[in-house]
Amino acid sequence: MAGKLGVLLLALVLSLAQPASARRKLLVFLLDGFRADYISDEALESLPGFKEIVSRGVKVDYLTPDFPTLSYPNYYSLMTGRHCEVHQMTGNYMWDPDTNKSFDLGINRDSRLPLWWNGSEPLWVTLTKAKRKVYMYYWPGCEVEILGVRPTYCLEYKSVPTDINFVNAVSGALDVFKSGQADLAAIYYERVDVEGHHYGPSSPQRKDAVKAVDTVMAYMTKWIQERDLQDDLNVIIFSDHGMTDISWTDKVIKLDNYINLRDLQQLKGRGPVVSLWPAPGKHSEIYNKVRRVEHMTVYAKEDIPSRFYYKKGKFVSPLTLVADEGWFITENRESLPFWMNSTVTRKPEGWQWGWHGYDNELRAMRGIFLAFGPDFKSDFRAAPIRVVDIYNLMCKVTGVTPLPNNGSWSRVMCMLKDPASSAPGAPPCACALVTVLLVLLAILA
């Protein structure tokens, strides 16, 4: 009797130990600056590629980014499931007073130092450490050695990828999936963000950029079928933030009108969020001057709202300036960000007309999330999610155990065909039951 009971208990233990879902391949798209309403129900009527994806998969109402609603902080929140103050990538421009090193939009040599990147482990590092094969195309940071690890393949971002680059990346990613060379492929596309900055979020140029993405999405769904990948490949599409209109004629805050810039030890960033390090002995003077400036809010580090999940960041400055929506903070008029024309002369052609970085609860800062594939429901609309929630979902469909994170599994589990399945990794109740059963087996032995 004991022997039969032991066999039954062993079978139960083994069944509980199995992963909740089969491990499948994952293709991820990061569409920079793609605002939620760019694929509203009305907009989808003229976007057949996205419309097909929505009908075949999951679409959330909107995605709330982390504060600040800038690119690098949200790149890392997406891939770690952690808020900015946890993973430490707190801006597009950062400064470390201890080493006098700067992170400048990832383009300067010091931006590749482990100092900025080793605060958390992104998904591609976790997968690579697990001997999984990762291919990344233009993804910012894939060229950096993080925690001693690089992905299997990184096509480094050096300039804005063209539409042809994007098409080739999608086709190449599907080819390496088909040949068994990749378990995860991640593709970054920037044109929607670029056109939104240059011409504004409602401009024809921005709309043309979305249509260009839509065309590639339509080809992608066709190519997946042609390569017979539809039963083994999940696709997840998200953005890092939205975009809002800005005005250069009457909504610019020039700091040199209020403070002596020589009283600053360091200044980083311009636009919606600016970081100030006052010179020794100048903190109170600078604070009292800038806090009277209209159309922006000034926070001492300890007073930053907790809902931003920002103030505990290692590289957060003593004073943070946050502009009202549509306003732009800069050192002086000479520092306004002209954009260059495409002619040989490369002369400044005009000011930019769109920006992001504002309060993450603003409607214009909302991003997108779409997913389809064998693990996802079809024609399913989900409630809003937050940028940190996506990490757990990616871990789930790739079959890896997530690291500790700030995401909510309850907000994303409804998207899966098997919503009753456990969160990534063994659920606590199952783990406890397995332990009890193992003890019983030991007693019966």
Swiss-Prot record:
Protein's cellular compartments: Cell membrane
Keyword Disulfide bond belongs to the record: yes
Lipid linkage positions (GPI-anchor amidated serine): S421
CDD domains per UniProt: Enpp
Inhibition and activation profile: Inhibited by EDTA and EGTA in vitro.
Keyword terms, alphabetized: Cell membrane, Disulfide bond, Glycoprotein, GPI-anchor, Hydrolase, Lipid degradation, Lipid metabolism, Lipoprotein, Membrane, Metal-binding, Phosphoprotein, Signal, Zinc
Family: Belongs to the nucleotide pyrophosphatase/phosphodiesterase family.
Complex formation: Homodimer; disulfide-linked. Homotetramer.
Designated name of the protein: Glycerophosphocholine choline phosphodiesterase ENPP6
Species of the source: Bos taurus (Bovine)
